[in-house]
């Protein structure tokens, strides 16, 4: 049940004007059962002074593409009402003309483009107006007997408006319906949503919430009298079993849905999702259509339902069904586009955004983790709507042609243009070992800065969490995650890749960077020291690369590995035989994997740094003293010593190595594998030959 959370004390402290609207909007948007992500809109009418100092009536309305839950004052657009109100006398107004007209009504050209539904707010005579998409209300609006149900709940207090796409015509229909019903307190838009109003921001909010609560109570009473979704077809698998299966199957799904463009995945196994996917009605009900027009751009018209029996069929069968299911969905989506397209339309990715798997839950796809979560959140709202609608009558949706025209509607697509452009590592996932160290953290930041999703793997979990937290703060929740990994432990490495699969669907880039270093004259090198170097830098690189290779093969979309070697990979360092030997091993292992990985599109290259002291745990250890002693200098003279021995007379920093790593991982090096790059300022003894 939605809750009334208006705080009168806080509201009283707000400046009069737009901040009141911001507060109300944030409250409404904070409950996704009331308002979809990015959907709905709010408004208020005020008196302002124009640039001449004259008082004019202004309507503040949500700007297109913003989200009620998080929007601020600058996300609203102010429009001159005296310029808008005369439009109601017109008989029609095409979308393009409406958008152009409203641009001339804005009090400030720097304001965002006003909402598609601006006229709906302007044509109603009330000071405050809310348009929302509550689950309970849409359940009524998407029931075949919805109008009758509305009469049972609201009597003569509502206006029912048949489905019309948002714009001038719908706005005029709503205004006329309200004007013709003196008892009207709300508008129900068929297959769409709710409109409410009030003379103060608080009374408008109260009306929105109370109207929804009435619907919820009515629907809950009916749900309790029915077998939800026709009853259970399957039992959900135990949680640990679900995760075990998903860890192996997510890369298969990711590969299947990434035929055209790479996708980031997320999964959802909330109780409401499991109730739906395991139900008798799910196979048919899920294919009827979208529960709300606002869902279409993010969920497509229907999900992919995998008809897998979790009680009798194995994971291999599930993988086969996913591959064939995605292939069928893709061809059907392309046919859907062809049947309905208009001049200028460009097809989206054909792969499903929502995949329903009995016993397991829901997998969602998107260009980023955030957008895959949006698809999932919206489909959970669709499940709630279908649950309510089927308790009232039959669930109905838009016809195919109208669904298409909403999905490809220029006014809806405009919102997508407001997102930042994709960068080099957008849609990709990079796992970096030693990610909390100097080079590792620089690589993590470099990938994130160009759109990548980053898994910061390190034995130092606190350091890894710090780096991941910084990335999420800078680029958004879900862009990075930290995993504890001891690269010498097979179970740690396998667990990290399983977590990568569960979090994002798999990996595209792996940077083998975890390291240490020791220094001893050869005849004083102990077996313990030798094994330590071999375990971390040899076995560790092998284990990480092997698990990466497996996951990349399962995805069947190629991939890139970058080994961080050393100048010592090609140069025999004095008093460092164990370290230098295993660094040579690393680069040859990289070449061996490159030779095997080519047929799968898996590239493997190496970056050979030298003397990267900044932020390095290695150089903060006894290694600094040991190397200084080897050169007969003081530890604090080491950095200058290294600079002077380079041909370019430069110091090398973590960001320099990160740049080379990024190059090998990028499309710029898509035809390069088995290669090495030295980033050492030019140490003649380490010139590759």
Swiss-Prot record:
The alphabetical list of record keywords is: Oxidoreductase
Which regions span the lipid bilayer? none
Q: Does the keyword Ribosomal protein apply?
A: no
What's this protein's family per the entry?
Belongs to the short-chain dehydrogenases/reductases (SDR) family.
| Enzyme Commission numbers on file | 1.-.-.-
The record, for PROSITE patterns, names: ADH_SHORT
Q: Where does substrate bind?
A: 566
Q: Which SMART domains match?
A: Aldolase_II
Taxonomy of the source species: Bacteria, Bacillati, Bacillota, Bacilli, Bacillales
Per UniProt, what is one GO molecular function of this protein? oxidoreductase activity
The residues annotated as the active site are: 579
Q: What is this protein called?
A: Uncharacterized oxidoreductase YuxG
> Which Pfam families does this UniProt record tie to the protein?
adh_short, Aldolase_II
């Amino acid at each position: 049940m939605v809750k009334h959370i208006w705080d009168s004390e806080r509201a009283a402290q707000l400046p009069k004007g737009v901040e009141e609207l911001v507060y109300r909007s944030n409250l409404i948007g904070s409950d996704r059962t009331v308002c979809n992500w990015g959907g709905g809109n709010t408004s208020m009418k005020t008196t302002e002074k124009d640039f001449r100092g004259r008082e004019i009536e202004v309507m503040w309305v949500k700007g297109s593409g913003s989200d009620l839950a998080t929007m601020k004052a600058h996300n609203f657009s102010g429009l001159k009402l005296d310029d808008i109100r005369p439009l109601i006398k017109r008989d029609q107004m095409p979308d393009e003309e409406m958008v152009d007209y409203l641009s001339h009504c804005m009090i400030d050209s720097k304001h965002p483009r006003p909402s598609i539904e601006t006229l709906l707010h302007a044509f109603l005579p009330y000071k405050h107006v809310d348009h929302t998409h509550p689950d309970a209300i849409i359940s009524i609006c998407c029931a075949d007997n919805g109008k009758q149900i509305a009469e049972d709940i609201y009597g003569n207090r509502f206006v029912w408006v048949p489905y019309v796409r948002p714009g001038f015509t719908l706005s005029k229909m709503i205004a006329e319906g309200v004007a013709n019903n003196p008892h009207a307190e709300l508008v129900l838009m068929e297959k769409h949503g709710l409109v409410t109003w009030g003379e103060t921001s608080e009374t408008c909010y109260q009306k929105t919430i109370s109207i929804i609560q009435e619907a919820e109570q009515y629907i809950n009473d009916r749900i309790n009298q029915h077998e939800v979704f026709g009853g259970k077809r399957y039992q959900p698998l135990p949680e640990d079993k679900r995760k075990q299966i998903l860890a192996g199957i997510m890369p298969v799904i990711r590969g299947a849905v990434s035929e055209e463009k790479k996708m980031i995945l997320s999964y959802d196994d909330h109780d409401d999702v499991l109730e739906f996917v395991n139900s008798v009605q799910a196979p048919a009900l899920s294919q009827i259509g979208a529960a709300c027009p606002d869902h279409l751009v993010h969920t497509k018209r229907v999900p992919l339902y995998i008809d897998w029996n979790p009680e009798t069929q194995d994971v291999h069968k599930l993988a086969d069904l996913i591959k064939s299911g995605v292939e069928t969905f893709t061809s059907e989506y392309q046919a859907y586009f062809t049947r309905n397209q208009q001049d200028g339309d460009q097809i989206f990715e054909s792969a499903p955004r929502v995949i329903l798997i009995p016993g397991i839950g829901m997998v969602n796809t998107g260009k980023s983790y955030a957008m895959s979560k949006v698809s999932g959140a919206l489909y959970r709202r669709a499940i709630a709507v279908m649950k309510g609608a089927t308790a009232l009558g039959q669930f109905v949706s838009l016809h195919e042609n109208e669904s298409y025209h909403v999905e490809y509607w220029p006014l809806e697509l405009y919102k997508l243009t407001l997102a930042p452009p994709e960068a080099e590592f957008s849609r990709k996932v990079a796992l970096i070992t030693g990610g909390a160290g100097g080079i590792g953290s620089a690589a993590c930041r470099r990938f994130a800065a160009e759109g990548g999703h980053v898994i910061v793997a390190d034995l130092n979990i606190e350091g890894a969490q710090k780096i991941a937290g910084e990335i999420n703060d800078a680029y958004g929740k879900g862009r990075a995650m930290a995993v504890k990994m001891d690269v010498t432990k097979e179970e740690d490495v396998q667990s990290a890749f399983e977590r990568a699969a569960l979090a994002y669907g798999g990996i595209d880039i792996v940077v083998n960077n975890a390291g240490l270093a020791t220094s001893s004259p050869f005849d004083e090198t102990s077996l313990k020291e030798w094994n330590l170097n071999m375990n971390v830098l040899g076995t560790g690189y092998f284990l990480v690369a092997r698990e990466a290779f497996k996951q990349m093969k399962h995805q069947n979309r190629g991939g890139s590995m970058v080994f961080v070697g050393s100048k010592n990979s090609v140069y025999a360092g004095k008093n460092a035989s164990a370290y230098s030997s295993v660094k040579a091993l690393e680069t040859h292992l990289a070449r061996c994997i490159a030779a095997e990985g080519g047929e799968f599109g898996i590239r493997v290259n190496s970056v050979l740094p030298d003397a990267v002291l900044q932020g390095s745990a290695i150089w903060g250890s006894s290694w600094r003293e040991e190397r200084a002693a080897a050169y007969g200098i003081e530890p604090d003279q080491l950095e200058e010593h290294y600079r002077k021995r380079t041909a370019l007379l430069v110091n090398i920093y973590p960001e320099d190595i990160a740049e080379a790593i990024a190059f090998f991982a990028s499309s710029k090096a898509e035809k390069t594998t088995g290669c090495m790059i030295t980033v050492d300022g030019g140490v003649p003894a380490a010139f590759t030959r």
